[in-house]
């Protein structure tokens, strides 16, 4: 879970706008606090909840991915330094091999993530259209 989620729930927001926070320290994804209008319909609430769930799912994926990357990179660097001697630094070429291998190992997981990300976002198109129609008529009545 995002490190911002517990502290950001206490923030008093201007309800006219969505708020975008700083990048999470682990996932590197910015926390988005979606606005909640006073007269939010059930349709709008469901759409907002679906977007919040998608944002959390995305942040969780990248947090897990980045933690795995950091752990494996540390292990790689430690192993290389034992081979080279403590005073030597791991070269950029050696690190590029690690990056290549890491991405190759994660290829299937990344493809699954991309497919799911597109599926979830495409599923939000119809609810977004319905919510925007509701908001258009609400604004037209003013």
UniProtKB/Swiss-Prot annotation:
Topology relative to the membrane: Peripheral membrane protein
One Pfam family in the UniProt entry: COA8
Major location (coarse): mitochondrion
Keywords of this entry: Apoptosis, Membrane, Mitochondrion, Mitochondrion inner membrane, Transit peptide
Protein's GO biological process: intrinsic apoptotic signaling pathway
Keyword Mitochondrion belongs to the record: yes
This protein's GO CC annotations: mitochondrial inner membrane; mitochondrion
Function: May be required for cytochrome c complex (COX) assembly and function, COX being the terminal component of the mitochondrial respiratory chain.
Family: Belongs to the COA8 family.
UniProt protein name: COA8 family protein CBG23705, mitochondrial
Organism, as annotated: Caenorhabditis briggsae
């Amino acid at each position: 879970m995002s490190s911002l989620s517990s502290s950001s729930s206490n923030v008093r927001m201007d309800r006219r706008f969505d708020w975008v926070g700083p990048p999470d320290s682990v996932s590197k994804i910015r926390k988005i606090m979606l606005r909640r209008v006073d007269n939010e319909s059930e349709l709008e609430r469901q759409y907002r909840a679906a977007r919040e769930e998608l944002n959390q799912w995305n942040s969780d994926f990248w947090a897990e991915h980045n933690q795995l990357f950091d752990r494996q990179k540390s292990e790689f660097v430690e192993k290389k330094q034992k081979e080279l001697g403590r005073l030597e630094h791991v070269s950029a070429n050696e690190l590029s091999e690690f990056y290549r291998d890491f991405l190759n190992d994660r290829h299937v997981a990344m493809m699954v993530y991309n497919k799911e990300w597109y599926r979830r976002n495409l599923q939000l198109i119809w609810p977004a259209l319905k919510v925007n129609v509701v908001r258009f008529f609400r604004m037209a009545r003013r």
